[in-house]
Curated annotation (Swiss-Prot):
It comes from Arabidopsis thaliana. This is ESCRT-related protein CHMP1A. Keywords: Autophagy, Coiled coil, Cytoplasm, Endosome, Membrane, Protein transport, Transport. Its main location: cytoplasm. Signal peptide: none annotated. Pfam families: Snf7. It is a peripheral membrane protein. It is found in: Cytoplasm; Endosome membrane. Disruption phenotype: No visible phenotype under normal growth conditions, but double mutants chmp1a and chmp1b show embryo development defect. PANTHER family: CHARGED MULTIVESICULAR BODY PROTEIN. One of its GO terms (biological process) is embryo development ending in seed dormancy.
Amino acid sequence: MGNTDKLMNQIFELKFTSKSLQRQARKCEKEERSEKLKVKKAIEKGNMDGARIYAENAIRKRSEQMNYLRLSSRLDAVVARLDTQAKMATITKSMTNIVKSLESSLTTGNLQKMSETMDSFEKQFVNMEVQAEFMDNAMAGSTSLSTPEGEVNSLMQQVADDYGLEVSVGLPQPAGHAIPTKTEEKVEEDDLTRRLAELKARG
């Protein structure tokens, strides 16, 4: 029983740590919003270098927030596994008592007592299956985030768009992401229609 108490204390400590990580994540989210506002003000003043620094800070805070959340999630998964282990230990003890009761029922030939014992036996097995399934579905894993130049530019452009500011000058656009104009779309559509007509004519 002492081991079970120790395990429950560990579970409590891990849950507390997970909550602390979630609080840190919320703090980073708040700081990210603050940095974005600084990006806006810097853009309004034409201070693009300052805006870039604030954008980098915002992205770094977002990265920290995600890392805190991932670590919290992994701790929750560990807690789930330990919680299952603690419950399984309790169930194992119950199973031992049930087996003893079953042996006693078999010895005395008490069918009613044997039936009641088997009901308890089956119920414990169902509990074990449910706990095992929950443990198998526990979350785990972590990935890392980077803050490339393109992401900084993207965040600055996003803030500018949100507040209706002009910042396209001096912000390099990522290759391969140009938005086609209506005229370009119309030309492509007409060209496709023409080629389909030619194919039908050949057929």
